[in-house]
Every structure is written in structure tokens, then in C-alpha cells.
A protein has these predicted regions:
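Hydrophobic transmembrane alpha-helices and their immediate loop junctions
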Residues: 1-394
Length: 394
């Protein structure tokens, strides 16, 4: 669900000033054929060279990575005014366990928690026979929901992992997060052990997860809606997931307008696809370390923080607008209005306090994003709008 930077376990010891000066001279000799050096500076253990590149940034980065590694440094290319800065940072080793026991255990526990959650979604008439049979069969009624949701999340994480390895970024295996409520999971995270090489690589790693997950979610919702049915509405009312523009359109194309007094009873596979769309939409918020935040950085560079803050402000405004609209629609019922608009405030709060607005830049922050990737980035932002439900549960 989210690419989370790993916490450093051990950083190369900060060398004494005299050693830094010696290293600075060695690094300068390895930079001079790549950068016409106009200025150099030592900031603690960081050595900065400023000037004009003599070759294109991607090639410069490849050369400098190999040249700096023997000295225990890694290069970062930055634009500073009208000059290019080559920053040499000490190498860091990150605490990403190489054993996969924890990954496997969390995956198994998450499978069980989503299976239990799936029992609450097995109310479709399709499962009448299962509900009438043994306890074991009733328990297995949670499989369609659990299998579908885990497939969406698993392929999402696999998209991140495979793309990161292809782009030579060091990442961990996914850590799935079980939950005793809701859908039975809070998604998964992948720990990054190294920065992305450039904006294209950063974009590929970020966008691969949501797009891969949607490649499973769309067939799932088509099948789920095909197996859903329109039934009479129960006398006491019912609780249902709120529609996004995407899910409403797909349901309308399948069933047309629902007659008064009837409701759509969705198959658990459709419920799991709905959950997959929601998780993907939340991940595409252009904020911080979320997939959408990485896409925003690749698209807009240093403006990504302003975009993230504007996104949170927009969520709060939508929350206030939703509350006022529902307050009027319910005849002044403040509790009902707050319940209908609470999701906007929760999303804004979680993003602000748990995700934040910081993003680790790539090694090469000079090379622009390719036009094709810019188009895919716009598609991802459109998908966010289409998949985000104004009301989660009504």
C-alpha cells in the first residue's frame, strides 16, 4: 500500500574535519571531468560541489555512484539557482531484516483476519446454501471477500516490489498489516533501503502498485456485480458502502436505476473490489510518502509540499461542506451530519499526523519526467477522483 523509508540502523561514522578535507580533495578529482567546479563546500560530513555539468545528468550519476562508493559516499544531483550541486553524502545502512519470517507471519495473519471480515459480507443470496450447511462451510463463505481483497493488495505490493528491483532500488518484501475491524487489514508497507535513482524511477515504483492492483480490482468488480442481485429493501433499513463515481457508474450499467423499495445486494467479491478501490484512492492522495505523493514529486518536484498541504486543506473544506449540506438535508440533525462527513476529517488528520508532507528526493533530481509518464500521472489523479466515495458508509 505504501512505500515507507526504512529507519537508518547504522550510518558511516562522521569523519574528523581533517579526514573530510582529504576525502573532499579525492572526491573533487573524481568530479572534475563531470562537473566544471565553480564552488565547493564542506557541511559536516557532506561535501558539496557546485558548477555546470559537462554530460547529461543520468550519465553523470552513473559515473559518480561508482566513483564515490570506494570513499563511502553516495552522490545526489540538485539544482541550486543557475548551478548544479553534486552533494556527496556518507553511505547509510538501513534496518531492513533479510529474514522473511515476519513477512510470512503477517501475511498469514492478514489472510485470517480478512477471512473473518469476509463473513460479514457473505449475505448475498448466492451463499444461501453455505449458510444452511456446516459451520466449516459457513466459515469458508468469507473466502470470496478475503481472496479478492488479498489478491488486490498482494498484486499492488508486487507491482511496487518488482518495479523497484527492476530499477535497482533496494526494497524489502511487503509487510501486511492485519486489523481486527473493518476489512480485516490496513494494507501493507514496503521498506525502501535506498533512494530512487531519478524521477522516472520514482514515478515507476510509485505508480506500479496502484495500477497493478487495479488490474485485479476491475475484473473483480465486474464479476462481483454479475453475481449481485436487486432485492426488496428490509423494513428496518440497511447499511451500505457509499458509491464513488466509478462504482455508481458500473452498477448503473449493470442494473440500471434501482426501483423504489429495492436495494442492490452486492456479492462479497464486489465488496472486496470496493475496498480495493478505496485503498487505492487513499494511496493516490498527492501527499508525502503515499504513492500519490511520490507521483506528485516526480511530476512537480519541489512544489510537492505545497500540493500536499493544498490536498489536506481541500479535504477539510470538503468535510465542512459535506457537514453543512447533510445538516440541512437531515433537518438539523448534527450527529447524522457529522457521521456522514466524518471520513473527510479522518483522512485529513491521518495524512497530516501519520504521513506528513516530507518526501525523500531521488539521487538525480535534475532529469525531467518523460512525457508518457506525465500522461500516466494525470490518469492516476483522475482515477483518484473517480474512485473516492464522498460518503464511505450510509
Amino acid at each position: 500500500m505504501r512505500l515507507w523509508p526504512a529507519r537508518p540502523r547504522r550510518r558511516s561514522a562522521v569523519p574528523p574535519p581533517e579526514d573530510v578535507l582529504v576525502t573532499e580533495e579525492q572526491l573533487r578529482r573524481n568530479v572534475e571531468d563531470v562537473l566544471v567546479v565553480r564552488d565547493r563546500q564542506v557541511r559536516g560530513s557532506v561535501v558539496v560541489f557546485r558548477g555546470v555539468l559537462t554530460i547529461e545528468p543520468r550519465r553523470a550519476l552513473e559515473l559518480l555512484i561508482d566513483r564515490f562508493r570506494p570513499f563511502g559516499y553516495t552522490p545526489f544531483l540538485r539544482q541550486e539557482g543557475d548551478t548544479v550541486a553534486v552533494q556527496a553524502w556518507p553511505l547509510a545502512e538501513t534496518a531492513v531484516p533479510r529474514r522473511i519470517g515476519v513477512n510470512v507471519l503477517l501475511f498469514v495473519v492478514t489472510c485470517l483476519s480478512t477471512l473473518v471480515a469476509g463473513l460479514s459480507f457473505a449475505g448475498s443470496p448466492t451463499f444461501d446454501a453455505l449458510r444452511a450447511s456446516s459451520s466449516a462451510a459457513r466459515f469458508l463463505a468469507g473466502l470470496p471477500f478475503a481472496f479478492t481483497l488479498m489478491a488486490i493488495l498482494g498484486v499492488h505490493e508486487l507491482g511496487h516490489y518488482v518495479t523497484a528491483r527492476y530499477d535497482r532500488a533496494a526494497v524489502s518484501l511487503p509487510y501486511f498489516i492485519p486489523a481486527p475491524f473493518g476489512f480485516g487489514t490496513l494494507g501493507a508497507i514496503i521498506l525502501m533501503r535506498s533512494p530512487a535513482r531519478d524521477r522516472n524511477s520514482l514515478f515507476d515504483i510509485a505508480a506500479a502498485g496502484p495500477l497493478a492492483g487495479l488490474a485485479v480490482a476491475f475484473p473483480a468488480i465486474f464479476l462481483g456485480l454479475a453475481w449481485s442481485s436487486v432485492v426488496p429493501m428490509p423494513p428496518g433499513g440497511y447499511t451500505a458502502f457509499g458509491d464513488s463515481a466509478l462504482t455508481w457508474t458500473l452498477a448503473y450499467l449493470r442494473f440500471g436505476p434501482i426501483p423504489p423499495g429495492y436495494m442492490l445486494f452486492t456479492h462479497p467479491m464486489a465488496d472486496a473490489a470496493w475496498a480495493g478501490f478505496l485503498v487505492t484512492a487513499l494511496n493516490l492522495f498527492p501527499v508525502g510518502q503515499l504513492d500519490g505523493g511520490r507521483i506528485a514529486y516526480a511530476l512537480f518536484g519541489r512544489y510537492h509540499r505545497a500540493i500536499g498541504k493544498a490536498t489536506v486543506s481541500a479535504l477539510l473544506l470538503f468535510g465542512v461542506g459535506s457537514f453543512l449540506w447533510n445538516f440541512r438535508a437531515t433537518g438539523g440533525d448534527a450527529f447524522a451530519a457529522l457521521a456522514s462527513s466524518l471520513n473527510w476529517f479522518v483522512w485529513a488528520g491521518l495524512i497530516s499526523f501519520l504521513v506528513g508532507f516530507h518526501h525523500t528526493p531521488p539521487l538525480d533530481d535534475l532529469s525531467p519526467l518523460s512525457p508518457g509518464r506525465r500522461l500516466v500521472g494525470v490518469v492516476c489523479l483522475v482515477l483518484l477522483v473517480l474512485m473516492l466515495p464522498p460518503v464511505v458508509i450510509h
